[in-house]
A protein has these predicted regions:
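Solvent-exposed interaction patches of small proteins and small membrane subunits
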Residues: 1-102
């Protein structure tokens, strides 16, 4: 299977959009965030979106490299083992996968 650059470019655009939405709506303090449930929902939803997009990218890259992850977290672990992803980032993403499932 060949790497689909168009898919990756689209996913990276979606990731940028999710991060941008979080950045543009980020409150100046934790107190302001805690006081605004709509803002909390927007931030959480875009964090979930960003994590899911990263999972999609990692799964695509793993599959393109003949890896067969059984879970979302395994995709990051396998990419790190192949030297395609920093180990610390892989560990953080595995934790983020768990956050997404909360």
């Amino acid at each position: 299977m060949n790497l689909n650059r168009d898919v990756l470019i689209a996913k990276l655009g979606q990731l940028h959009d999710a991060i941008d939405r979080i950045e543009t709506k980020r409150p100046r303090s934790l107190e302001l965030l805690l006081a605004d449930r709509d803002l909390q929902d927007m931030v959480c939803k875009n964090i979930e979106r960003a994590v899911q997009i990263c999972i999609d990218i990692a799964t695509h890259l793993a599959t393109m490299n003949a890896l067969a992850p059984k879970t979302s977290g395994e995709s990051f672990k396998m990419l790190a083992a192949k030297g395609m992803l920093d180990t610390e980032l892989a560990t953080a993403m595995i934790r983020a996968v768990g956050f997404r499932n909360v």
